[in-house]
């Protein structure tokens, strides 16, 4: 067939015919008619359409309404002979011009087998959720991207040009009687003047078969760009491009260090237990648009630097957790401020060092987080330089089923206690001023012979806002810390989800798939072993108020009895003479000393020992320094 005839094709949709007088030994009723008729015997009432609209199935209601109206048309006004589909070029051009009612009125009723649809885009997409597995591989047909009609036996391809691009309906097959030829109806279109949509040639899928009153939303790939579209978004509406909009900006409202190393990310000083604001916003090419699909999920986590492997990080986290006052102590907490909750939702504490939430890229999101560990909490040695930590933010597409984030950024932090961050900044400012002063003095001495005056060298201003640095690596998995006991509890309550193929096909939310199996994340479950030490030893540093040097009290057992024995051994005070034993915190709170405080909250702590004589004995108070 010539190229000229191909360029003049109009949309001709082939639909199954209803009751028709027999001819050419064909049956009067085809199986397609019987299948479609089964959905049209009951009229589409207003209640039916309303229910379908409520369920988000507006396209199905429109498609069924069109087919229902089609079967009301008399047979002699809606039929066209199929045998003319491959005749001469004149017949082909003549058939392409049958879009008007005048041409349709000249058709003969006995030979007509094809319905001519006017230039109305019809969405005949089918729902993938209703697939029958037994039919997925029976009718696998591959079609080339050529725009010409394909002369395949039993198959007629009709080309559409001047219409709004819509999804193509997959090949539909129904069983036929003996002696009947198998016919497959294919709808194909070409897109024009729609630069935002990818070419849909070869978009046919064999495994998308369902009832004709269903719809589906499909994701497709063109080169390296992925675009996602819901069924409710029209063809003329903006399509949310996940990759092109994957540029985000995160800021931390904390003082930035004045000594930034070249080539490394920003360094920020934080105070332990103090809340800091993090702002998340989109800065990509799509920022000026109102995205119809605009929800993303971000995970904020505290991790170690990249030079620490997974085993090292887990080792540090387990050591830190073993020294906490309570097993429920988290590394990272998020505040329940109203200012924060107005911009985010679906908050989940997915790990002890990570929280996740959803937010709208059309709006700026703001959260308040606090870090509960010091940089020096990962070593038992005193005076050791603290380990650098990072606040890392991974942002995932909310509807994308990939474990790969669309954006990742980080900020280095050092965590201090008791306003140590402010002291560190002041020290850096003093050092910078001294260095600037020395440099200015030496330069003035070199230019002493000249009469010109040197301008003062401006000092680097401290910034109260730190910008996160984008990480190019989107494939490495962050280390999420969940203690063994808490992990077992999560398993029993069904709150841990694994990254499996079944779940990926099920379409669950991304964060629920972030946890890898316990054997992969934490290593194989260790077998029960005897404790290396029969009892846990506790070491206290105490001194009297008049002394300058501390004494070390080694408790043979982490109990009140063990503490009294250590005091008796060190200071010669009989155990039976100790009537009361108290602990006074830094805030001045006086509590009775018990075994739990000694075992979990007092190891390597420093105290001032005060012994007061009473009638019934001595009252011993350990005042925390």
Curated annotation (Swiss-Prot):
Residues 1-24, 82-112, 428-453 are annotated as: Disordered. The keyword Nucleus applies. Keywords: Activator, Corneal dystrophy, Deafness, Disease variant, DNA-binding, Dwarfism, Ectodermal dysplasia, Membrane, Non-syndromic deafness, Nucleus, Transcription, Transcription regulation. One of its GO terms (biological process) is camera-type eye development. Signal peptide: none annotated. Residues 1-93 are annotated as: Transcription activation. GO terms for molecular function: chromatin DNA binding; DNA-binding transcription activator activity; DNA-binding transcription activator activity, RNA polymerase II-specific; DNA-binding transcription factor activity; DNA-binding transcription factor activity, RNA polymerase II-specific; DNA-binding transcription factor binding; identical protein binding; intronic transcription regulatory region sequence-specific DNA binding. It is found in: Nucleus; Membrane. InterPro entries: CP2, TF_CP2-like. Changing residue 423 to A/Q: Loss of activity as transcriptional activator. The keyword Iron does not apply. Pfam families: CP2, GRHL1_C. The record marks 423 as: Important for activation of transcription. One of its GO terms (cellular component) is nucleoplasm. Induction: Expressed in proliferating cells, the expression decreases during senescence. In keratinocytes, expression levels decrease upon calcium exposure. Residues 98-109, 440-451 have a biased composition (Polar residues). Its main location: nucleus. It comes from the Eukaryota. Residues 244-482 form the Grh/CP2 DB domain. Transcription factor playing an important role in primary neurulation and in epithelial development. Binds directly to the consensus DNA sequence 5'-AACCGGTT-3' acting as an activator and repressor on distinct target genes. During embryogenesis, plays unique and cooperative roles with GRHL3 in establishing distinct zones of primary neurulation. Essential for closure 3 (rostral end of the forebrain), functions cooperatively with GRHL3 in closure 2 (forebrain/midbrain boundary) and posterior neuropore closure. GRHL genes (GRHL1, GRHL2 and GRHL3) show a paradoxal lack of redundancy despite their extensive sequence identity in the DNA-binding and protein dimerization domains and the fact that the core consensus DNA binding sites are identical. They have related but remarkably different functions during embryogenesis because of their differential spatiotemporal expression patterns during development. Belongs to the grh/CP2 family. Grainyhead subfamily. It is linked to Deafness, autosomal dominant, 28: A form of non-syndromic sensorineural hearing loss. Sensorineural deafness results from damage to the neural receptors of the inner ear, the nerve pathways to the brain, or the area of the brain that receives sound information. DFNA28 is characterized by mild to moderate hearing loss across most frequencies that progresses to severe loss in the higher frequencies by the fifth decade. Ectodermal dysplasia/short stature syndrome: An autosomal recessive ectodermal dysplasia syndrome characterized by nail dystrophy and/or loss, oral mucosa and/or tongue pigmentation, abnormal dentition, keratoderma affecting the margins of the palms and soles, focal hyperkeratosis of the dorsal aspects of the hands and feet, and short stature. This is Grainyhead-like protein 2 homolog.
């Amino acid at each position: 067939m010539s190229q000229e005839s191909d360029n003049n094709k109009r949309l001709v949709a082939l639909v199954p015919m209803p009751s028709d007088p027999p001819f050419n030994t064909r049956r009067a009723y085809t199986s397609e008619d019987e299948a479609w008729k089964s959905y049209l015997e009951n009229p589409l009432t207003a209640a039916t359409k309303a229910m379908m609209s409520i369920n988000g199935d507006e396209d199905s209601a429109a498609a069924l309404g069109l087919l229902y109206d089609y079967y009301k048309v008399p047979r002699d006004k809606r039929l066209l002979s199929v045998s003319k589909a491959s005749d001469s070029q004149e017949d082909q051009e003549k058939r392409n011009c049958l879009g008007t009612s005048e041409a349709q009125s000249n058709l003969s009723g006995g030979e007509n087998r094809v319905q001519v649809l006017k230039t109305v885009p019809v969405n005949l997409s089918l729902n993938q959720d209703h697939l029958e597995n037994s039919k997925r591989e029976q009718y696998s047909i591959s079609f080339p991207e050529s725009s010409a009609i394909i002369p395949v036996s039993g198959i007629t391809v009709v080309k559409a040009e001047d219409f709004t691009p819509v999804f193509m309906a997959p090949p539909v097959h129904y069983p036929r009687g003996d002696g009947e030829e198998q016919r497959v109806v294919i709808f194909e279109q070409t897109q024009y003047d729609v630069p935002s949509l990818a070419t849909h040639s070869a978009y046919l899928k064999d495994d998308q078969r369902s009832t004709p009153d269903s719809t589906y939303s499909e994701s497709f790939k063109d080169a390296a760009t992925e675009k996602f579209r819901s069924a409710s978004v029209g063809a003329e509406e903006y399509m949310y491009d996940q990759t092109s909009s994957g540029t985000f900006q995160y800021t931390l409202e904390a003082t930035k260090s004045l000594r930034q190393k070249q080539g490394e990310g920003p360094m920020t000083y934080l105070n332990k237990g103090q809340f800091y604001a993090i702002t998340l916003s989109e800065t990509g090419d799509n920022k000026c648009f109102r995205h119809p699909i605009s929800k993303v999920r971000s995970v904020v986590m505290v991790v170690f630097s990249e030079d620490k492997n997974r085993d090292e990080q887990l080792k540090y986290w387990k050591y830190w957790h073993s020294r906490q006052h309570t097993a429920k102590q988290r590394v990272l907490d998020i505040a329940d401020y109203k200012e924060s909750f107005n911009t985010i939702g679906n908050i989940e504490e997915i790990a002890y060092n990570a929280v996740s939430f959803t937010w709208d890229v059309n709006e700026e999101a703001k959260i308040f987080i606090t870090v509960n560990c010091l940089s020096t909490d990962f070593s038992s040695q005193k005076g050791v330089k603290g380990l650098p930590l990072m606040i890392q933010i991974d942002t995932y597409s909310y509807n994308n089923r990939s474990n790969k984030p669309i954006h990742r950024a980080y900020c280095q932090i050092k965590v201090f206690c008791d306003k140590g961050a402010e002291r560190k900044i002041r020290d850096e400012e003093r050092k910078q001023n001294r260095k600037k002063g020395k440099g200015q003095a030496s330069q003035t001495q070199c230019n002493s012979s000249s009469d010109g005056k040197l301008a003062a060298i401006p000092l680097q201003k401290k910034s109260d806002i730190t910008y996160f640095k984008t990480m190019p690596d989107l494939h490495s998995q962050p280390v999420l810390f969940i203690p063994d006991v808490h992990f077992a509890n999560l398993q029993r309550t069904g709150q841990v989800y694994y990254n499996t193929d079944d779940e990926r096909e099920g379409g669950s939310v991304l964060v629920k798939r972030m946890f890898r199996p316990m054997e992969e994340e934490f290593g194989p479950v260790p077998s029960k072993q005897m404790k290396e030490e029969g009892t846990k030893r506790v070491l206290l540093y105490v001194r009297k108020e008049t002394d300058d040097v501390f004494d070390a009290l080694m408790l043979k057992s982490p109990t009140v009895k063990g503490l009294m024995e250590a005091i008796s051994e060190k200071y010669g005070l009989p155990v039976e003479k100790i009537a009361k034993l108290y602990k006074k915190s830094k805030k001045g709170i006086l509590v009775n000393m018990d075994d739990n405080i000694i075992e979990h909250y007092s190891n390597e702590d420093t105290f001032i020992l005060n012994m007061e004589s009473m009638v019934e004995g001595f009252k011993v108070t350990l005042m925390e320094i």
